[in-house]
């Protein structure tokens, strides 16, 4: 947080030129966001200052929430019935100083309207005097196996780790801080498969389009380190593997926060120092993938035309229409004499086949991908339809038409003649941790339940409860 260059201290439109496709809706303006936390039916994140953001669905955000104490770069974690909030007062190179205190408080609700809302001070758990090689700001929690850890620090000195009492939030008696990294700030902590991951923000902040913020990571088998990157370089010597950098017109990602939605869906929050389309620091949410044991940023689906391929069978999602041959002299392939000039074979066009399609709802199945019009789907966000954590609801239509993928009351999918915006025509598309995608209906007619699109056998799609252990519900989107 707050290291200036000098002091070293979506609208709903998806940008085709930007791989990070979905900009959050509403007014997601924040700097140094805390880990997004669910409380009393809403999602909350808090930033530097006393304000924060609130959302009912994780897609449309507005100003809201209440966090007393001010200060910079808070973090939030829920343990039992308490929400612990850490924040720093002072430091960060502001007003030329690095003297700071990391403080803890707790509440039983983050909703100011709840009878359980009300903050209780725990006190100071870490400090820097402005003279030592330390700047005690940017705290981050990790709770694993009954133990509560807190990292903090900036470029001005080391990143340190301490242990807190999860029952009270206070620092454990006699606990000594341990240096675990340098050359980073705005750290975050993860635990996965026996590894502890330390993510830190590198680069310069707080200068909009000129900021070089980006997030790197190291890992250790012990929460106190040593942390090393994928090349074996210790984080205490400036190492760190890239997790996310600037993409498109979103510049300066920093302040990582894990959002584990379960069922193989992980995302992360951060701020961008600037969204060039809005001219301000904004909240960003991206899928989180895991590759060879390391976290890496994924991408929401960008608006465009795709082949949608089943991971189970390798077949493509398509209208169940009669097969129409491409005009072609097969003998030419086998028996053309030497020296015969090559002849371009044009793609089959929509105009050649659509007149033969029924003007009603058509079944959808899976088949060999052959670059046919009935296999090309245009995916686009639906303005005003809302969304889910970090992503909008999409419509999926046969390219060049209004024939729209829709859920049926019998747990099947079909293509209806026109898009109306009905819930059964809206789709949630989440990137899974392996890089494939889960496609879920917003609602199934008759039940209103969300169901996952899966491949039953080789050629039959259906809508059922998602099984994260099965490849049947995993899809890839490929450019034709």
Task: Walk through the language-model features, giving the residues of each.
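Positively charged n-region of N-terminal signal peptides that target proteins for export
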Residues: 1-4
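Terminal recognition/anchoring or ligand-binding modules at protein termini
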Residues: 433-480
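A structural signal for the beta-strand cores of small, secreted beta-rich domains
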Residues: 198, 288, 312-337, 343-362, ...
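Acidic, Ser/Thr/Gly/Pro-rich low-complexity segments and short DxT(G/T)-type signature motifs
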Residues: 413-418, 460-464
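Bacterial N-terminal signal peptides
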Residues: 7-17
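Carbohydrate-active catalytic/glycan-binding domains of CAZyme proteins
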Residues: 21-323, 329, 340-341, 345, ...
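Cationic, beta-structured binding surfaces that engage anionic biopolymers and membranes
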Residues: 395-399, 403-404, 414-418, 425, ...
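Functionally engaged cysteine thiol sites
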Residues: 205-207, 355-358, 404, 418-420, ...
